Amino acid sequence: MVRLVSRTIFNEKDMMRKLFFGLLTALILAACSSDPVYHGMTPQQKEDYSKAIAGKYTGTYIIIYNNGLNDAKAVKVENSQMTITDQTMHSVCFHNYPVSQLSRVVADSALAEALACAPNVDFQADYHFYDMQDNGDANWGFEPAAIPLTLHYDGADHHLVLKLNSQTYFLLSKASLDAGKPFANQSVFQFAVAGIYEGNTLLQDFDDFWQDNEFGCLTYFQLNEE
């Protein structure tokens, strides 16, 4: 009799254990099934989406800089312009970017003085569509490469390159694209100066912008509300 009860209790526990793990598996599968499903985009889809985002945009440059005193400050340049091309060029062009603001964070005084007098520049960044969801929402991002500059200081011309990086990615809503407002849900483009080079020589590194007492310059292009 005792053995029978013991066996019955064991069977009930075994059944409860199986039921628990069965329910847990079902919940996991249900959660996984609700996750977005991503897949690649066809050339035609990329072309259509590129046409949907192409155009001229107005916004504000917000340039945040740290001058090495652990005291980040910001400069705003309103009525700034940005152009996005279609799939043929697949580029984002930032217009009249004030590279002179970088002079605030350059350690070399001669270079800083030359930068302070530098005119605004246009520069381009390549963009890419990475994948899309079944509902038509697409992942998109841009990759700024570099800004070439020729500055005269220390009695000579210096051919410099401002290397840039960006970690901004967008989920472009199909509904926003159809409504003609592709960046309604995410309207900030971010990029940073990673370093200043002359040829292969690194003149100054800005990779540690968020570290205390480090020099750095981070730029946001905030689109105006449509």
What is the role of each PLM region?
Residues 21-24:
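Sec-dependent N-terminal signal peptides
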Residues 59-65, 147-149, 190-200:
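Generic short beta-strand segments
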Residues 38-41, 164-226:
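Edge beta-strand at a domain terminus
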Residues 12-19:
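Positively charged n-region of N-terminal signal peptides that target proteins for export
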Residues 89-177:
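Predominantly extracellular/secreted and cell-surface proteins with exposed
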Residues 4, 9-12, 32-113, 226:
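Acidic/polar, low-complexity intrinsically disordered N-terminal segments immediately downstream
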